[in-house]
């Protein structure tokens, strides 16, 4: 899932991460016991940037996800939604979930519009195209159900998420294939109703370990 989230974000941006505003992690999670989230963004360039931020709700964070309507207009709020970010400066963007307190996990796209300040000022006077100096970056925010039910099944190296909230799962230990070295590690996000088989770690070995996070709680599985 993490690979799909990264691919989605890169497809949205149309540019490489090294060329864009630093918006931190591609995917962010708001746990069921929290209604706020903070993301730090940084302008690592030598010129000021004009940043505008927009939110969209998605049917899924995967490649086939579609933009859908929010349950209420103020379901997810943020501040600031627009700012001028000086060269080499940072800013904290805060998100507030005010949607239904139900058993449904919700997914949002955070769209960051980044433009060089000098070009933005020129646009106001001349409206000239500045496509080469601007960027549109997409990241994902997952809001866990307010009534989270964490359940899973594990058998023969495969984890299945039978609950209603995304799990972060991992395996570590001896590599399944000698060509991969002696020690291997795998990390994935596992959405509700999905299964994942570990393919690099020999989970059948006595030294092979499987674990997961339920929100901030670490759970050993094997």
UniProtKB/Swiss-Prot annotation:
Gene3D superfamilies: Immunoglobulins (2.60.40.10). Part of the ecpRABCDE operon, which encodes the E.coli common pilus (ECP). ECP is found in both commensal and pathogenic strains and plays a dual role in early-stage biofilm development and host cell recognition. Belongs to the EcpB/EcpE family. Pfam families: EcpB_C. Induction: Negatively regulated by H-NS. Positively regulated by IHF and EcpR. Keywords: Chaperone, Fimbrium biogenesis, Signal. Residues 1-20 form the signal peptide. This is Probable fimbrial chaperone EcpB.
